[in-house]
Amino acid sequence: MNKMVTIDPTHAATAEMTVNARVATDGAPLTQHPQSLLDLPPGEARQSLLAVHGILGSKLPPTSLAIYEAGGGSTSYLPLDVLRRAHVTVVDIDEDQIRTNDYAQETILGDVQTYRFPLGTFDLVICYNVIEHLADVEAALVGFCESLKQGGLILIGAPNPRSLSGVVTKHSPHWFHVWFYRYVRGEKTAGQPGHPPFPTFFHPLVTLSNLESFAKTHGLQTIYRKQYESPRYPEMRARKPVLAALIDTLARVVNSMLPGKTDVRHGDYHVILRKR
């Protein structure tokens, strides 16, 4: 479990912090960022998450916040200054994930595809590494939209189904995903209850272009979108350099056959949507 400390004695929220006072690539002390960001290897994933944090800091109201996290275990991807002034409500279908969550004020054992809140409840809905695991993404997104206040934001972080890693994930058995997490990423608890990888569906709305089309027809404006190299690549280059070199070579060959500047290593994306 990530190390957590209380940020505000008058607030029940806790947030991941580090005592290391090094400086992040955006010039801010690392203590201002959650452990989830600090754990990312240097590269596009970290840069995009820093950009996301900047947008959330500037676009969300400077007052207390109501946040709905759709699926939430022991890790928060929100900037600490947002968590300090937020009442976070987590909904997750996995009892183990709920049990390990220690930063939310309210945890609900439920299905984000069917669970509904009163209209206009939240300033921010965050769904991070979740929609790829849902069979009915549309139902979940409709619920997110309905629960959002006017001008509120939805942050989605998800894998790109059209990337190299997305195609492999979609067309390989779950046991292979567990093997990859254990022996390539070095996560010995992979596949155990409450630990990733979780079964993946890749509903059509996980594809970014489809997601943006859905957003447009449901009164949502895209204010940030970024496809970036999956952090798995720099991790592999450090842990398994021979395997990483082979995969990088394969990716370059595939890229050479694709139009434009397509990079099949862009395995993940961030998108922020604002309710008009």
Indicate where each model-derived feature is located.
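S-adenosyl-L-methionine-dependent methyltransferase catalytic module, highlighting the catalytic core
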Residues: 138-139, 143, 153-274
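Conserved N-terminal segment of class I S-adenosyl-L-methionine
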Residues: 2-120, 124, 227, 264-270
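A short beta-strand submotif of the Rossmann-like class I SAM-dependent methyltransferase core
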Residues: 124-130
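Conserved SAM-binding loop
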Residues: 90, 133, 156
